Amino acid sequence: MAANQNVTKKKKAVIGGIFKAELNNFLMKELAEDGYSGVEVRSTPARAEVIIMATRTQNVLGERGRRIKELTSVVQKRFGFEEGSVELYAEKVSNRGLCAVAQCESLRYKLVGGLAVRRACYGVLRFIMESGAQGVEVIVSGKLRGQRAKAMKFVDGLMIHSGHPVNDYIQQAVRHVQLRQGVIGIKVKIMLPYDPRGQNGPRNALPDHVQIVEPQEEVLPKEPHSQHKEEKKDVQVPAAQPVAPVQ
């Protein structure tokens, strides 16, 4: 019985992962021009809530919510949901400079527009670092100039590559661009800043993080004064009595 329950949970997890991957691929194509940055699925017994994260939420919603209703209808038909069992919401990305997906899409549109690779990458690098990131790494690979494919890496700031903090501090995204000379691959990695509030970065500090506490200002006395301390009284210890020898 327990084995059947485990298999059922495993199948349910696989189905949920496939649904999220297909939904992400669908929304990536539909909302590419609207700053699509990711999707979050919250499933309840009654219905499923799909939260679309984008930089331009007004374009996602459309005039009087028309576009979000059309997307809801398409998702219901494409993924076999019953009518009224799925709801789509749009959430604005608070700081798009720290969103790897948004910056990857921004770099993709710059390359499609004909901007030079080096200039486009340095522009994205500068914008991410000005947004408060600890570090950034941009890799562009493919036929960039000649017929031979190569990769160009642009790095700035601090970047960690191993350990458990990678799961909390590193955001990465991969996109592909179809240009005239061939397909160009783009990879953007951003190291988020430490934020105790949890808004722009993780709340957990790095293991090697050292916080220096500012010393308190010493309050100087305005007038001369003296302190009288009570003197400790000497406690007299009774002298040891001689012990009579044992005969």
From Swiss-Prot:
It comes from the Eukaryota. One of its GO terms (biological process) is positive regulation of apoptotic signaling pathway. Gene3D superfamilies: 3.30.300.20, Ribosomal protein S3, C-terminal domain. Residues 216-247 are annotated as: Disordered. The keyword Ribonucleoprotein applies. The keyword RNA-binding applies. Disulfide bonds: none annotated. GO terms for molecular function: RNA binding; structural constituent of ribosome. GO terms for cellular component: cytosolic small ribosomal subunit; nucleus. Keywords: Ribonucleoprotein, Ribosomal protein, RNA-binding. This is Small ribosomal subunit protein uS3. Pfam families: KH_2, Ribosomal_S3_C. Residues 236-247 have a biased composition (Low complexity). InterPro entries: KH_dom-like_a/b (IPR015946), KH_dom_type_2 (IPR004044), KH_sf_prok-type (IPR009019), Ribosomal_S3_C_sf (IPR036419), Ribosomal_uS3_C (IPR001351), Ribosomal_uS3_CS (IPR018280), Ribosomal_uS3_euk/arc (IPR005703). Residues 219-235 have a biased composition (Basic and acidic residues). Residues 23-94 form the KH type-2 domain.
